[in-house]
Swiss-Prot record:
Homodimer. Anthranilate 1 binds at G82. GO terms for cellular component: cytosol. This is Anthranilate phosphoribosyltransferase. Pathway: Amino-acid biosynthesis; L-tryptophan biosynthesis; L-tryptophan from chorismate: step 2/5. Mg(2+) 2 binds at D227, E228. Its cofactor is Mg(2+). It comes from Hydrogenovibrio crunogenus (strain DSM 25203 / XCL-2) (Thiomicrospira crunogena). InterPro entries: Anthranilate_Pribosyl_Tfrase, Glycosyl_Trfase_fam3, Glycosyl_Trfase_fam3_N_dom, Glycosyl_Trfase_fam3_N_dom_sf, Nuc_phospho_transferase. The keyword Glycosyltransferase applies. The gene is trpD.
Length: 340
């Protein structure tokens, strides 16, 4: 098979088999495809619409090429990483939630990078807080095991991405790689809360993660467009638990966390985001604190620390109120600095 054959097939709106897709991905990720070929394949895939089988095959290739973070004990381990691209410019909700979930007993292997489409990516924010991002996989594992949170800076773990990064920037449209990021956690966390930018991705993501072996996952998209669980609208959920996918809805008013809009969550910089997170962890009872609890609650739930989502939300409120989340945030910063 040539890349030209794959391209012809996609242009004729024919899906690729798992084997074909794996071959195509190997070509793209190994530097054997030219920039023009990479762009053509990515655009043709998006125009056709990526299938669950194609996404699963692509994700498994990316996982196999990633620099792994090896954790022997995966009890209560969870990843929080969304697709981004919701255009809402809110503070780093899933990053803040990671520390709250960890304070509640989850082990968070967070995977993220610098901003692509927002004012502040998780890496931008953590750097502002004084976190050392240049850790070896062993040091990341040590953070997860001792503090409860580890941050994997995506470019350091996905070096094969260097072959496609230039093309992604040049074409500037959403492609398969926006979808793959959250599916390729280098620590292979068995549980995950994953926010998506469109409700059409809820079921496909749940199906892909089932194929990839995830145990308990919540894929979320809020009806106001947010790729997080929202305080200003209902949030649609596709939940994968032990092989079964169920769809349900989260209503913030049921958790005393509903607000008229998202205006209090908007930011212009990583510093703004950090200021909001410090206030939340200082127990400021704000709209920001409410959205952190709704999202951390999901991580606490899928990690297996509690048995219902409602218990997860309550536990998130507790560890913020008693200062445990704030203490853990500071411990994490210090731990990463100790490796410098």
């Amino acid at each position: 098979m040539q890349l030209r054959d794959a391209l012809e097939q996609l242009l004729n709106k024919h899906d690729l088999t798992a084997e074909q897709m794996e071959w195509v991905m190997q070509m793209l990720m190994s530097g054997q495809a030219t920039s023009a070929q990479i762009a053509a394949i990515l655009v043709a895939l998006r125009a056709k619409g990526e299938t669950v089988e194609e996404i699963t095959a692509a994700a498994s290739v990316m996982r196999s090429l990633a620099t792994q973070v090896t954790l022997t004990d995966k009890t209560h381990m969870v990843d929080t990483c969304g697709t981004g691209g919701d255009g809402a410019n809110t503070f780093n909700i899933s990053t803040a939630s990671a520390f709250v979930a960890a304070a509640a007993g989850a082990k968070v292997a967070k995977h993220g990078s610098r901003s692509v489409s927002s004012q502040s990516g998780s890496a931008d924010l953590l750097e502002k807080a004084g976190v050392n991002l240049n850790l070896t996989p062993e040091q990341v594992a040590e953070c997860v095991e001792t503090v409860g949170v580890g941050f994997m800076y995506a470019p350091a773990h996905h070096s094969a991405m260097k072959h496609v990064i230039g093309v992604r920037k040049e074409i500037g449209v959403r492609t398969l790689f926006n979808i793959l990021g959250p599916l390729t956690n280098p620590a292979q966390a068995p549980a995950q809360v994953l926010g998506v930018y469109d409700s059409s991705l809820l079921m496909p993501f749940a199906q892909v993660l089932r194929e990839l072996g995830s145990k308990h996952v919540m894929i979320v998209h809020a009806q106001d467009g947010l790729d997080e669980i929202s305080i200003a609208s209902l949030t649609d959920v596709a939940e994968l638990k032990e092989g079964v996918i169920t769809q349900w809805t989260i209503d913030p008013s049921e958790y005393d966390a509903d607000h008229p809009d998202l205006s209090e969550l908007k930011i212009d910089s990583a510093q703004d985001s950090l200021n909001i997170i410090h206030a939340v962890l200082a127990n400021d009872h704000s709209a920001a604190a409410d959205i952190v609890c709704l999202n951390a609650g999901a991580s606490i739930y899928v990690s297996g620390v509690v048995s219902t989502y409602a218990e997860g939300v309550q536990m998130a409120k507790n560890v913020i109120a008693n200062g445990q989340a704030r203490t853990l945030f500071n411990q994490f910063v210090e731990k990463t600095q100790s490796f410098a």
